[in-house]
């Protein structure tokens, strides 16, 4: 049983409570729920970004996170320097980084802009660099908070294709999503979070069905299902 608490203006609140979860090779877990349910907090606890106040977490394998990708960048350093710096933070050796530098640069499509400090980059350019470096590893466990939506359409399409490849190759996938379609399409398990607790766990279709009935009512839920998910 894991608990994660954080500070608010009124003191300590429980962001996650009574979370018990075990994932094995081949598992693809969708985490769904309303805003403020604790979805992103749970993902960050899994990534060991947030410490827990009670319980334990056991992780076996290399984790890659597709959120907060800008962490670890030096705004005064050039794009090239940040590729190497971020690579080290991702657990790559200097030799491994050098083998990946060219591919990272080509994927980012930043060209000569890699020679200048990233503080001069537009938000779109920075996303290109951060994404290109963060997805250069081959993780055992992939933690993903939605899909990429920022940046120009061409790069977003290319980036989402890479994410799809990583989702297929990772031994374990954990996907936080507001898309019920993605939960069913990509995952074989799902949990519904509400107020930091697991309200429902099981097959994605069953969990999505429960969630839709909870927020919309049974009639609207059945109409929605007939139009989208259960025509597959």
Language model features: what each stretch is:
Residues 32-34:
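The feature captures the beta-strand-to-loop junction immediately N-terminal to the Walker
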Residues 186-203, 211:
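H-loop (His-switch) and adjacent beta-strand-loop-beta switch element
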Residues 177-178:
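H-loop/switch region of ABC-family ATPase nucleotide-binding domains
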Residues 1, 84, 96-113, 130:
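Conserved ABC ATPase "signature" region
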Residues 209, 213-232:
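ABC ATPase nucleotide-binding domains
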């Amino acid at each position: 049983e894991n608990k994660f608490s954080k500070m608010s203006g009124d003191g300590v609140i429980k962001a996650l409570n009574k979370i018990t979860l075990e994932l094995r090779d081949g598992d693809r877990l969708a985490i769904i729920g309303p805003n403020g349910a604790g979805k992103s907090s749970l993902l960050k606890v899994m990534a060991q970004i947030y410490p827990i106040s009670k319980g334990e977490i056991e992780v076996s394998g290399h984790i890659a996170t597709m959120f907060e990708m800008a962490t670890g960048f030096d705004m005064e350093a050039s794009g090239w320097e940040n590729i190497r710096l971020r690579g080290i933070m991702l657990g790559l050796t200097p030799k491994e980084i050098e083998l990946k530098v060219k591919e990272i640069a080509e994927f980012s499509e930043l060209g000569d802009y890699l020679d200048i400090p990233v503080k001069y980059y537009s938000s779109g350019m920075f996303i290109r660099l951060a994404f290109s470096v963060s997805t250069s590893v081959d993780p055992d466990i992939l933690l993903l908070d939605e899909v990429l939506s920022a940046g120009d359409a061409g790069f977003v399409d290319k980036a989402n294709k890479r994410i799809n490849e990583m989702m297929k190759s990772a031994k374990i996938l954990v996907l936080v999503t507001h898309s019920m379609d993605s939960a069913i399409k990509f995952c074989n398990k799902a949990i519904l979070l509400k107020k930091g607790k697991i309200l429902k766990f099981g097959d994605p279709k069953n969990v999505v069905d429960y969630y839709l009935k909870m927020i919309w009512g049974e009639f609207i839920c059945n109409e929605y299902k007939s139009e989208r998910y259960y025509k597959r």
